[in-house]
Every structure is written in structure tokens, then in C-alpha cells.
């Protein structure tokens, strides 16, 4: 959302090329991540994006693609992400019951819960952008209206915060790597690190008066926790992969899962009692 903003003369001419290159790298990396999550979910009969994080990301893409962004690359990327989200959503609805057998109320109502979460998150994103733009938040002398770059920063940062923290929590709770892989982690980690954090860090370094919010206490907390969780995720993934079991149908289960649990999953899958 900053592609149309022209920096003042004192800002290095490298500002826009580096800013756009890092942003586009993030877009490509996250597109690859979504594709791999969809593929791995089908292959392992699981899903790799936490339920609330997926609902929030889908709602964000929908609201911003349809109503907020005007740059062609951003609009195209968000539309593509929405389309790629479809098989991920399918994986949750088809295989999520296997991951939620410990919570029957959730497993029986996954569809309703997902639809409700998407609606809730869409309302939140719509309210945020409507309030920000309507009140011209972040307005500066060199801007007409609200600072859309800052608005996008807070919205995207919270999306990534949820994905990073919840993905780590999901991996720890499951104890298996169903729906995820090394390439999924790497593309997600680098997409966020370079496409978001380094992107705005460069903007802050070269044009600090317009991007001082990047080093504010809330922002440092958000991108700091996001980065730490993404790094820790790699170590946890290694531990989980070293100890999990793969079943004959491609599903993965925690090393400590007993035969009764595995049998329960098979019954839930086939619908047998």
C-alpha cells in the first residue's frame, strides 16, 4: 500500500526498489507457503494452518482485496491467496475431525466454527480499516488522508503474530507434523522476515519520520515475538519429526500415541463405531 507514495528528496533513491523487492519476495514466499500447506494437508490427511489463524488470514485477504488495496500486485496476491486458501479450508473440514477428537464439540461443529470465525475476523478487519481511513489516522503533511502504509503494517503484523504463535502452539500440542513440512516453515519464516519485518525495517532506516511506528514498543513486541516463535518452530519441528510415526494411509501421529488412539482415528475416518 506504499507503492504509490513518493518519498521526499532526502530519502535515498534506493528506497522504492528495495522496498518493493522485499515486499514482492514476501508475496511470492507466502504464495508458495499456501500452496505447500494445501498440498501437505491433502497428503497427510491433516491441515497445517491453525483454525483461527486461517480464518483471520482469509478474512483479511477478503476485506483488503475487495475494498482497500488499489495496487495491482497487492490485489492480485491477495486474490491468489484467497483462492489457495480454498483447499486448506477443505482440508480442515475433511480431516479436522481427526485432529479434534479430544474436543468432540469442536470436531462436530468445525464448519460452523470456521464460518463464524471468518465472519468475526472480517468484521474486525472492516472495522479497523473503516475507522483508520475515516478518521485519517497517521495523517502527515506529505499525505492526503490516512497513512495506509501504517494501517497495513498493523493489520498484517497482527495476522503474522497469530500465525506464528498459533502454529508453534499447534505443533507442540499435536506432537506430529501432519499438514506441515520444512519448506512450509522456511517459506513462511522468510516471507514474514523479509517481506514484512525487513521491508518495514528498511523503510524505517531510510525514511524514519514516516515509519517511526516500526520501532514503537507495541511494534517491537509484535515483530519480536513473531520472529522468536518462527525460529523456535524450526527446532520443535525437528524434534517432532524425529519422534513421530507415519501410518499406512499417510497420516502422522505423535510418538506417544497408543494403538487405541490410532484405532479411534481410523473409526472416526471410516465412520465406524
Swiss-Prot record:
GO BP term (any one): terpenoid biosynthetic process
E.C. number(s) listed in UniProt: 5.4.99.-
Top-level taxon of origin: Eukaryota
One Pfam short name: Pyr4-TMTC
InterPro entries: PaxB-like (IPR039020)
Subcellular locations according to the entry: Membrane
Pathway assigned to this chain's UniProt record: Secondary metabolite biosynthesis; terpenoid biosynthesis
Molecular-function annotations in GO: isomerase activity; lyase activity
Main location: membrane
Family statement drawn from the similarity comment of this UniProt entry: Belongs to the paxB family.
Function of the molecule: Terpene cyclase; part of the asc-1 gene cluster that mediates the biosynthesis of both ascochlorin and ascofuranone, a strong inhibitor of cyanide-insensitive alternative oxidases and a promising drug candidate against African trypanosomiasis. The first step in the pathway is performed by the non-reducing polyketide synthase ascC that produces orsellinic acid by condensing acetyl-CoA with 3 malonyl-CoA units. Orsellinic acid is then prenylated by the prenyltransferase ascA to yield ilicicolinic acid B. Ilicicolinic acid B is further reduced to ilicicolin B by the reductase ascB.
Protein name in UniProt: Terpene cyclase ascF
Naturally occurring in which organism (per UniProt): Acremonium egyptiacum (Oospora egyptiaca)
Gene from which this protein is expressed: ascF
Amino acid at each position: 500500500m506504499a507503492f504509490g507514495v513518493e518519498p521526499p528528496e532526502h530519502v535515498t533513491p534506493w528506497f522504492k526498489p528495495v522496498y518493493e523487492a522485499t515486499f514482492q519476495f514476501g508475496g511470492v514466499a507466502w504464495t508458495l507457503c499456501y500452496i505447500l500447506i494445501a498440498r501437505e494437508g491433502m497428503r497427510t490427511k491433516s491441515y497445517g494452518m491453525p483454525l483461527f489463524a486461517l480464518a483471520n488470514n482469509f478474512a483479511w485477504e477478503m476485506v483488503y482485496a475487495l475494498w482497500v488495496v488499489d495496487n495491482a500486485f497487492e490485489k492480485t496476491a491477495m486474490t491468489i491467496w484467497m483462492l489457495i486458501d480454498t483447499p486448506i479450508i477443505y482440508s480442515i473440514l475433511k480431516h479436522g475431525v481427526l485432529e479434534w477428537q479430544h474436543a468432540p464439540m469442536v470436531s462436530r461443529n468445525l464448519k460452523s466454527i470456521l464460518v463464524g470465525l471468518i465472519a468475526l475476523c472480517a468484521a474486525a478487519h472492516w472495522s479497523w480499516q473503516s475507522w483508520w481511513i475515516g478518521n485519517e489516522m497517521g495523517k502527515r503533511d506529505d499525505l492526503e488522508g490516512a497513512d495506509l502504509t501504517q494501517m497495513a503494517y498493523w493489520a498484517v503484523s497482527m495476522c503474522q503474530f497469530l500465525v506464528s504463535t498459533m502454529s508453534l502452539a499447534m505443533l507442540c500440542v499435536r506432537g506430529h507434523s501432519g499438514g506441515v513440512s520444512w519448506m512450509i516453515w522456511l517459506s513462511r519464516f522468510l516471507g514474514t522476515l523479509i517481506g514484512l519485518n525487513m521491508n518495514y525495517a528498511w523503510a524505517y532506516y531510510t525514511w524514519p519520520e514516516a515509519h517511526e511506528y516500526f520501532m514503537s514498543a507495541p511494534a517491537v513486541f509484535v515483530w519480536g515475538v513473531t520472529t522468536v516463535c518462527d525460529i523456535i518452530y524450526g527446532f520443535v519441528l525437528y524434534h517432532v519429526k524425529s519422534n513421530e510415526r507415519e501410518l499406512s494411509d499417510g497420516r502422522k501421529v505423535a510418538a506417544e500415541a497408543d494403538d487405541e488412539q490410532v484405532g479411534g482415528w481410523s473409526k472416526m475416518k471410516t465412520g465406524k463405531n
